[in-house]
A protein has these predicted regions:
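Acidic-and-aromatic substrate-binding clefts and catalytic sites of carbohydrate-active enzymes
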Residues: 49-54, 72-83, 105-109, 144-148, ...
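Mobile beta-alpha loop/short-helix "lid" or hinge segments that flank ligand
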Residues: 133-143, 183, 272
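C-terminal/domain-terminus segments
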Residues: 319-329
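N-terminal pre-domain/capping segments
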Residues: 2-135, 151-158, 162, 169, ...
């Protein structure tokens, strides 16, 4: 069982890790680390608002347009290496805000695969820290795998996150869990009838078994917070306004969340429509829909939160628009909303 650490122990262990990294990699320690900008700052999410642009052009586009950070992609940056990446980010003055956790999904793989992944996770975390990034992101499934009982899955997830926390705390890195709010994610079923892979139906075959009913897991801010608190001091939340809105989240939910548990923020907007009709690819640019983004950002300001804010407008709204224009639209719309709300 993992022994929880208090804030002082957490900071002491993180400091020792940084000192050890400096001894092992003096060239890394000597180079300038791209520091996190003060307050709330805009970070480019290329998969949403610079589609089709690869690394390192993503970072160059972020700097050209006016972003201060980038939600970066693991594979090409890892291939480029520490020195080249640090030099590029320092040249562009772009902060490496957050990255999706590489490797298998540690929350759903079997026990053997999970245990086998921990050594590589330690190395990957050290790499992220070496380029100045202190945030890994992982999406939470809104239902349990295979219809597993919720209590059983909760125990597995918190136990694994505690093990991940122990590894990442050495490198002063946080895990950011993103819950999925729209109803469609809670209706997902483990398997179902129908053909797969384009295979023709088998004549006279018996009907397939009925799909396992979905078992909802964690899909709201309040419950994600409880999961984080049960898992480790450096386990936090990606607060996505889209998922907050479609989980019927409230401003009070944000005000009840300790600022240190919010690791990253995504923002977009939504049409007014029945919850059962909402699909994840229907997102609008911030300010174009019905979300209470005033309450959202003012609540973040009230709790004293600072960090990266990424426009994540997924779907047709930005189709057929050039990547640079996507980035400019994302930056301009998010900036306008944040300035209107008095947080930027």
């Amino acid at each position: 069982m993992t022994v929880p650490v208090n804030r002082r122990e957490f900071l002491e262990r993180a400091a020792l890790s940084s000192a050890a990294l400096a001894l092992i990699h003096p060239t890394i320690a000597a180079a300038a680390v791209p520091q996190q900008p003060p307050g709330m700052f805009l970070s480019l999410a290329p998969w949403a608002t610079a589609r089709g642009v690869g690394w390192p052009d993503q970072a160059r586009l972020a700097a050209k347009v006016g972003f201060k950070g980038i939600d970066w992609a693991w594979g090409p940056v890892r291939e480029a290496g520490v020195d080249a990446t640090r030099a590029l980010l320092a040249e562009l003055r772009i902060h490496p805000t957050i990255v999706n956790m590489p490797g298998p999904n540690v929350l759903t793989v079997d026990d053997a695969a999970f245990k086998a992944s921990l050594k590589q996770l330690d190395e990957d975390t050290a790499f992220a820290a070496a380029i100045g990034c202190t945030r890994f992101q992982r999406t939470l499934g809104a239902t349990t795998p295979g219809g597993r009982p919720k209590d059983e899955h909760w125990k597995i997830v918190t136990g694994r996150l505690a093990a991940v926390s122990d590894i990442m705390v050495k490198h002063k890195v946080h895990v950011s869990l993103e819950f999925l709010g729209p109803m469609v994610f809670r209706m997902a079923r483990a398997g179902g009838p129908g053909r797969r892979g384009g295979e023709p139906p088998v004549p006279n075959a018996p009907p397939p078994p009925p799909p396992a009913p979905p078992v909802p897991f964690v899909w709201s801010l309040a419950e994600t917070l409880r999961l984080c608190e049960a898992s480790g001091p450096n386990i936090g939340i990606t607060l996505d306004a889209w998922h907050w809105h479609h989980s019927e989240g409230t401003v009070a939910d944000i005000l009840s969340t300790p600022r240190e548990r919010i690791v990253h923020v995504h923002v977009s907007d939504a049409r007014a429509m029945p919850p059962a009709d909402v699909q994840d690819n229907m997102r609008l640019l911030p300010g174009e829909g019905v979300m209470d983004l005033v309450g959202f950002f003012q609540a973040l300001r009230t709790i004293g939160w600072t960090g990266g804010v990424a426009c994540e407008t997924i779907g047709a709204r930005l189709d057929n628009i050039a990547p640079e224009e996507q980035a400019r639209l994302g930056l301009a719309s998010t900036t306008a909303v944040m300035q209107r709300d008095g947080v930027l």
